[in-house]
From Swiss-Prot:
It catalyses: D-mannitol 1-phosphate + NAD(+) = beta-D-fructose 6-phosphate + NADH + H(+). NAD(+) binds at A5, I6, Q7, F8, G9, G10, G11, N12, I13, G14, R15, G16. The lineage of its organism: Eukaryota, Fungi, Dikarya, Ascomycota, Pezizomycotina. It comes from the Eukaryota. Belongs to the mannitol dehydrogenase family. It comes from Aspergillus niger. SUPFAM superfamilies: 6-phosphogluconate dehydrogenase C-terminal domain-like (SSF48179), NAD(P)-binding Rossmann-fold domains (SSF51735). This is Mannitol-1-phosphate 5-dehydrogenase. The active site is at K213. Catalyzes the NAD(H)-dependent interconversion of D-fructose 6-phosphate and D-mannitol 1-phosphate in the mannitol metabolic pathway. Has a strong preference for NADH over NADPH. Required for protection of conidiospores against exogenous stresses such as high temperatures and an oxidative environment. Monomer.
Length: 388
């Protein structure tokens, strides 16, 4: 019997990143989703194309050997698929993990295979698999929790690939940048060994990869979007053509780089090269990436462990500089009432209805004693007062 992977989430990252590399590694991919149209499209089309875009041109891969199940209407089928799978991955958004955990827990519990299934969450969040693992344990009966690890192994991952907004008529096909990084911790697999997926870079310690990626790629991307939006830019590449915005992005990245170099075994030179590569990637006009797409979901992006407060709080704790990160936070706070983005409307409501102190705690998760709190509070007040 061939290798089988269950991929929760049939969106652009699920199809254009995770499934592409599972397919190339020889897995049959079973997509699981709750969106009727997505499941039907995957069921009705036996292939789709992933086009990698770079300055050198385009390269297209055809993805085949997949199926799709609607977990809303066919939960028992999903349970059976997980019971006989080699790998379970997901790309659903960190806030959806709690909703997919119950069916994954049932699928793991139904396993009789001697080899445990590998569970890898592919989300833009630190410790996403740990989070999913916690929810799965909550949905596993107490007498089965101890033997859970005979049936499943859980490994955190760091993913990095820019997926721009897709053309409205693209269907299942995905345009995506050529560059990617997919790092997964190998220690949880112990003597059993990790799955055979050549695209994955298996590492002993994932934290440096996750923080370097989140605090460089995601921080710079969002900083560009928020400054770009404030200055009326439509595309990320256009925003970075503006020398002032580019300079502001580099100042933010100097601060996050100082944290990465101080905290992890990464040299200044290596981080400088990484920053150069990242800014070049997000400047790529061929990606046709919109400012509003990159800036969407500001509440999540302003949260405690995310791309701004995450590094700024650690810099504050170390007594290091974080002024430029606060400029980026201010721009994120100004990303309000953007059409099609519910979080930007909710952000506007929070800032309109709550006192600055309450809004700061609500948005960032910082407590009043934290050394970063006063600096964020100052920016919240400034935005609430409507001063530029």
């Amino acid at each position: 019997m061939g290798k089988k992977a269950i991929q929760f989430g049939g969106g652009n990252i699920g199809r254009g990143f995770v499934a592409e590399f599972l397919h190339k590694a020889g897995y049959e991919v079973v997509f699981v989703d709750v969106m009727d149209k997505m499941v039907e499209a995957l069921q009705q089309n036996k292939s789709y194309k992933v086009t990698e875009v770079s300055e050198e041109g385009e390269h297209t891969t055809t993805i085949t050997n997949y199926r799709a199940i609607n977990s809303k209407t066919h939960e028992s089928d999903v349970i059976q698929e997980i019971a006989t799978a080699d790998v379970v991955t997901c790309a659903v958004g960190p806030h959806i993990l709690k909703f997919i955990a119950p069916v994954i827990a049932k699928g793991i519990d139904a396993r009789t295979e001697s080899k445990p299934v590998a569970v890898i969450a592919c989300e833009n969040a630190i410790g996403a698999t740990d989070t999913l693992h916690g929810f799965i344990k909550q949905h596993t009966s107490q007498d089965r929790v101890e033997s859970l690890y005979d049936r499943a192994q859980f490994a955190n991952s760091a993913i990095d690939r820019i997926v721009p907004q897709q053309a409205p008529n693209s269907g299942l096909d995905v345009r995506i940048e050529k560059f990617y990084e997919w790092a997964v911790e190998k220690t949880p697999f112990g003597s059993v060994g990790h799955p055979d997926i050549p695209a994955i870079h298996w590492v002993d310690n994932l934290e440096p990869y996750i923080e370097r990626k989140l605090f460089t790629v995601n921080t710079s991307h969002a900083t560009t979007a928020y400054f770009g939006h404030f200055r009326g830019k439509k595309m990320i590449a256009d925003a970075l053509e503006d020398e002032e915005i580019r300079g502001l992005v580099h100042k933010v990245l100097e601060e996050t780089a100082s944290l990465i170099v101080a905290k992890h075994d990464i040299s200044e030179e290596e981080q400088k090269e990484y920053v150069k590569k990242i800014v070049s990637r997000i400047s790529n006009p061929y990606l046709e990436d919109k400012v509003e797409r990159v800036g969407r979901a500001p509440l999540r992006k302003l949260s405690r462990k995310e791309r701004f407060i995450g590094p700024a709080s650690q810099l504050a704790e170390r007594g290091m500089k974080y002024d430029s990160l606060m400029d980026a936070v201010e721009m994120a706070l100004r990303f309000q009432n953007v059409p099609g983005d519910d979080e930007s409307a909710e952000l506007a409501n929070i800032l309109n209805e709550q006192r600055a102190e309450d809004a700061t705690i609500h948005l960032t998760g910082l407590d009043e004693e934290h050394p970063l709190y006063p600096a964020v509070l100052e920016r919240v007040r400034k935005v609430q007062q409507g001063t530029k």
